[in-house]
């Protein structure tokens, strides 16, 4: 069963495959690296982007943020430029915030947009050079929705780990029809049944606390989107529109809304959707549902 902990993740825009995934991959690499060597033994680092990850161009900021030690769920996206500034101005990378090495994005990031690795088109390799002349590297695949697997798991899946967990949850289902049938048989609502499945792995307070954090992040995203103005990144000079629409709707708020005035409610729904869309395009914190797209 795919958990709500998997479906709804706090991430960074604009793409779960091209920003959240690579950032997670960098986090995983740091975890693996620290088990292999001391950070002080690192003399250099190289990044290779393949296929679809290389095709959009210089969208490497998410990987660099991950190597700095930032995670998609906790990074303050308002400070992204501040975090990245030393890399571009001083040509230095502070690995995990603990060890500074020389790093030149033009020299140390390699783009192979016409090379597609066997498992998935969204692939990257991170390699560190060590003081003894050796190196340590890992290849990762960003498979969508912020999910990442390493090359070892992709080429040699563990059959035990690959066994679906659907058989051990209280109310297994493989389709919406099966979900509704389980609800009918056990006299449960959809929300009650899903909660029971979630609580098979973690206690209810943990589930509710996580969902509260997701809801708070969603609300914050809408608020930021309604407040921020300017031009969206990407080079197309697209102007943000949510702030102006928000001001317009607020000016009309004293006008009575009748019970059947569905169009008035839709104006606010459209505003919230636009606000989130613009925050995502701007590289802000958003919630995957189940992807940024």
Predicted regions and their residues:
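Conserved catalytic cysteine-centered active-site region
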Residues: 1-8, 12-13, 74-80
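Conserved phosphate/anionic-ligand binding catalytic regions in large, soluble enzymes, centered on
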Residues: 8-28, 59, 281-292
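Accessory carbohydrate-recognition regions in carbohydrate-active enzymes
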Residues: 12-55
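Catalytic cores of large soluble enzymes that bind and process phosphate-bearing ligands
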Residues: 14-17, 21, 54-58, 75-76, ...
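Buried hydrophobic packing segments
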Residues: 22-29, 66-70, 273-276
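Beta-sandwich/jelly-roll carbohydrate-recognition scaffolds of carbohydrate-active enzymes
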Residues: 40, 45-188
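Phosphate-/polyanion-interacting regions in eukaryotic proteins
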Residues: 133, 141-145, 163-233
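Accessory "access/gating" subregions that flank catalytic or transport cores
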Residues: 204-292
């Amino acid at each position: 069963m795919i958990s709500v902990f998997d479906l709804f993740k706090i991430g960074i825009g604009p793409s779960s495959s091209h920003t959240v995934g690579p950032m997670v991959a960098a986090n995983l690499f740091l975890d693996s690296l620290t088990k292999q060597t001391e950070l002080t033994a690192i003399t250099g680092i190289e990044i290779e982007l393949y296929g679809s990850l290389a095709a959009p161009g210089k969208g490497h900021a998410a990987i660099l943020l991950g190597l700095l030690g930032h995670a998609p769920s906790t990074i303050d996206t308002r400070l992204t430029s501040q975090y990245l500034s030393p890399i571009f101005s001083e040509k230095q990378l502070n690995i995990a915030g603990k060890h500074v090495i020389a790093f030149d994005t033009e020299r140390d990031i390699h783009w192979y947009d016409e090379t597609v690795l066997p498992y998935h088109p969204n692939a990257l390799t991170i390699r560190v050079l060590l003081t003894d002349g050796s190196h340590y590297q890992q290849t990762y695949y960003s498979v969508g929705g912020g999910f990442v697997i390493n090359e070892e798991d992709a080429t040699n899946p563990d059959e035990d780990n690959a066994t679906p967990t659907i058989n051990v949850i209280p109310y297994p289902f493989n389709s919406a029809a099966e979900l509704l049938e389980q609800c009918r048989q056990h006299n449960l609502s959809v929300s009650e049944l899903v909660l029971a499945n979630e609580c098979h792995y973690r206690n209810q307070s943990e589930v509710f606390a996580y969902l509260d954090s997701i809801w708070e992040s969603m609300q914050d995203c809408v608020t930021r989107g309604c407040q921020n103005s300017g031009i969206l990144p990407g080079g197309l000079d697209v102007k943000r529109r949510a702030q102006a629409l928000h001001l317009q709707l607020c000016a009309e708020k004293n006008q009575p809304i009748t019970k059947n005035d569905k169009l008035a409610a839709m104006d606010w729904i459209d505003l919230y959707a636009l606000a989130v869309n613009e925050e995502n395009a701007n590289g802000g914190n958003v919630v995957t549902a189940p992807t940024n797209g």
